[in-house]
Amino acid sequence: MAMTTYGDITPRTAAYVAVELLKRAMPYLCLEKFGQAKSLPGNKTQSMKFRRYNSLGLRTTPLTEGVTPSSEKLTATDITATLYQYGGLVEITDIIVDTHEDPVLQEATAVSSEQAAKTVETLRYNVLKACTNVFYANSVASRGLVAAAISRADQRKIVRALERQEAQHLTSIVKSTPSFNTESILPAYVGITHVDLTSDIRSMDGFTSVADYGKQQAWETEIGACEDVRYLKSTIFTPYEDEGAATSTMLTTSGSKADVYPVMYFGKDAYGLIALKGKYAITPIVINPVPSKSDPLGQRGSVSWKTMQTTIILNDAWMAVYECAATD
């Protein structure tokens, strides 16, 4: 049997499977929304260029009557990121296909989409939590001294630092759909962290629950807002286990030192990424358990996926990582 890029399925079926993969992946992709997102082009390039235009200087000299002022040129900073390929494979036997009461292809697609989304989101998290603009709860000097929960006072320090660096509020995000589109939002910074901090965030002075947003639409996994910041949560953004100070009141893995949770704050264009969206975002491959030279009895098949991905910090000053503990 002739094999295509997609295994034993046609390009049309592959396109359908890809859309299903992306639909199921969307709920896990918090970071997808807020970066400078680019869709993967059809030529499968191994690098992607992100561009940031530089600010113009001030013009404080009065104009002279009848004299055209000198012109300026736009300047930009280009940052090139290398793309890497990732993928996963689920093996299916002929017995499972013949005897399983559930639709095996659909189930394999479901678990593969979850695997793809969590893989991509974890890769992004590992890059972004390494931001050099770091704050510690209660203004301690290092991670090993962290033993306090998130607070509005600390948030205000972070927002002030972002504003001093002219980090702009987010005014648009990438839509939570398989296609590559954006939508406008009310200006805000965003804070993204682990689900363990949900109660502490809700306990912050001035917190507004998503239930009280009124006409403003809440995002998937959004907790609510506190002043300039809207907060989202995910199980993917795991803490540094036992790396905080000794504690008896904060969450801890070992029972002695606090787990330290990164909260990532973002302004506009703080980071760039390849969106898990669009025609070339992900490639599904389905191999049916049919006889072949390598499998004469047709006992083995598979459902797999692969994607080209990258994430890069574009400006450390336009984002921040705040490390805190979680109340037990």
What residue spans do the PLM features occupy?
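Alpha-helical scaffold segments that mediate packing/assembly in large oligomeric complexes
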Residues: T99-K175
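Short, charged/polar micro-motifs that form catalytic or ligand-binding hotspots
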Residues: L40, A76, D98-Q106, A110, ...
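N-terminal "assembly arms/tails" that initiate or stabilize quaternary assembly
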Residues: M1-T82, M319, C324
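Sequence/fold signature of self-assembling virion shell proteins
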Residues: A2-F34, G144-S176, A188-I192, D196-D328
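An acidic- and aromatic-residue-enriched active-site/binding cleft used to recognize and process polar
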Residues: Y53-S55, I95, L128, H194-D196, ...
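Short acidic, glycine/tyrosine-flanked loop/strand segments centered on an H-E-D-like triad
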Residues: K73-H100, K279, T283-I285
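Structured, hydrophobic secondary-structure cores that serve as assembly/anchoring elements
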Residues: Y84-H100, V104, T177-T193, S199-I201, ...
